[in-house]
Amino acid sequence: MLITFACTKCGTKLETDAAVSGQAVPCPQCHERLTVPAPEIREGTTLGGFKIEHLLGKGGMGEVYLARQLSMDRLVALKILPAQLCTDKSAENRFLQEVRVLAKLDHPNIVAAHEAGKDGGVLFLAMGYVKGQSLEDRIKREGHLPWKDACGLVKKLASALDYAWEK
């Protein structure tokens, strides 16, 4: 995956591999040291065999997109880590270790991990896509959950956490 950006000093257009995002490179024209930006992830971008359809949500640990796994023609939730974590080798190792742990979990209330990797300097995790609304959206739309629904949800969450903790 290539990244195109301009030198902030002289305006020269640069093109470099996304694998070096976050690293400093010299401008070939004025020799200014520039930090290669993270690749832009947008609708239609293909990353590690997954074609991005649209953004599902953002959080402190990255963005989650609805994507199509091209090899299996199925929808997945594709988590993409922030650029600053993608260039930190220890963060990458922690991420891949967590992915290996997640891959061993098989529980009805835990989304399955399908694949993880790095493409063009971008770390990603493909997980099962669960169609529906987030709990946050439901509460915004309906207000507080009825007691029975809240208890049922907590029971499922506790079951998943207990299972994961035992593994």
Place the predicted regions along the sequence by residue:
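Conserved ATP-binding/catalytic core of the eukaryotic-like protein kinase fold
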Residues: 2-167
